[in-house]
Structures are given as C-alpha cells and as structure tokens.
Amino acid sequence: KEQPEFVPY
C-alpha cells in the first residue's frame, strides 16, 4: 500500500 508521509507531531 502507498504509505503517506508519517509525520508524528
């Protein structure tokens, strides 16, 4: 699956 940019804010 295409993973979105993981941005843990």
From Swiss-Prot:
Bilayer disposition of the protein: Single-pass membrane protein
Membrane-spanning segments: none
From the UniProt record, give the pathway where this protein acts: Energy metabolism; oxidative phosphorylation
Q: Which UniProt keywords are given for this protein, alphabetically ordered?
A: Membrane, Mitochondrion, Mitochondrion inner membrane, Oxidoreductase, Transmembrane, Transmembrane helix
> Can you say what this protein is called?
Cytochrome c oxidase subunit 6A, mitochondrial
Q: Which family does it belong to?
A: Belongs to the cytochrome c oxidase subunit 6A family.
What organism does the record attribute this protein to?
Thunnus obesus (Bigeye tuna)
Gene Ontology biological process terms from the UniProt entry? oxidative phosphorylation
Its cellular-component GO annotations read: mitochondrial inner membrane
Per UniProt, subunit arrangement is: Component of the cytochrome c oxidase (complex IV, CIV), a multisubunit enzyme composed of 14 subunits. The complex is composed of a catalytic core of 3 subunits MT-CO1, MT-CO2 and MT-CO3, encoded in the mitochondrial DNA, and 11 supernumerary subunits COX4I, COX5A, COX5B, COX6A, COX6B, COX6C, COX7A, COX7B, COX7C, COX8 and NDUFA4, which are encoded in the nuclear genome.
> Which domain of life does the protein's organism represent?
Eukaryota
The protein's role, per its UniProt record: Component of the cytochrome c oxidase, the last enzyme in the mitochondrial electron transport chain which drives oxidative phosphorylation. The respiratory chain contains 3 multisubunit complexes succinate dehydrogenase (complex II, CII), ubiquinol-cytochrome c oxidoreductase (cytochrome b-c1 complex, complex III, CIII) and cytochrome c oxidase (complex IV, CIV), that cooperate to transfer electrons derived from NADH and succinate to molecular oxygen, creating an electrochemical gradient over the inner membrane that drives transmembrane transport and the ATP synthase.
Compartment(s) where it occurs, according to its Swiss-Prot or TrEMBL record: Mitochondrion inner membrane
One GO molecular-function entry:
oxidoreductase activity
